[in-house]
Amino acid sequence: MKKDSAEVGFINKANYQTGSNRDYTNAAMEKKKPSLLLHACCGPCSTACVERVVQDFEVTLFFYNPNITDKNEYLLRKETLLQFVNAYNAEHKDEFTVNFIEGEYDVQRWLDRTDSLKDEPEGGARCDICFAMRLTETARQAKKLEFDYFTTTMSVSPHKNYDKIKTLGMILEDEYGISYLDIDFKKKNGFARSVEMSKQYGLYRQGFCGCEYAKLAQEAKRENDR
């Protein structure tokens, strides 16, 4: 199966490196804040990420996660994200609005790209393909909908390699001609803050990343730890 060129580039350019000297801190000083399409992997991860960027950007969360192959789990995570968005907007209604859009739930496309890698360990080649598929679609939608920037909440997880995410983001920036927001959300205690905010908003926190393979691996680990 032919893969998107960015997916191929991400895999083949493991040593691709590029620096970013852009300063985003003055964005809020401009008359109109730049727009950001923020790929949201789930509600809990989105909390601290939204808090981090919402003062400087017009934020729209993009829920595109075909890796969540269990439909009930997918719907639960979407509803959890909307639970947070609605509560956060209500709290800050006089300051800003965080928007939400949902991507296509194309599970079969995700399975076609990852089936041969189902035995890969967490963080391996299967995850690389998964990152690439989701962030590529985010960049594509950001270009189509004329956003100024795109990025993802995935970097808030301590289990996600930001160098890989950034490399992919910069490749996609070149390919789509739209700016990748270079930000590692796990820094400045981002993950701890996401846990704190999830408790504050009473959000469901899942015990695995998303795909069935990761779920089985987590279940096996829990069984071995008993």
Q: Where does each model-flagged region fall?
A:
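Nucleotide-activated chemistry modules centered on ATP-dependent adenylation/adenylyltransferase
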Residues: 2-51, 56-226
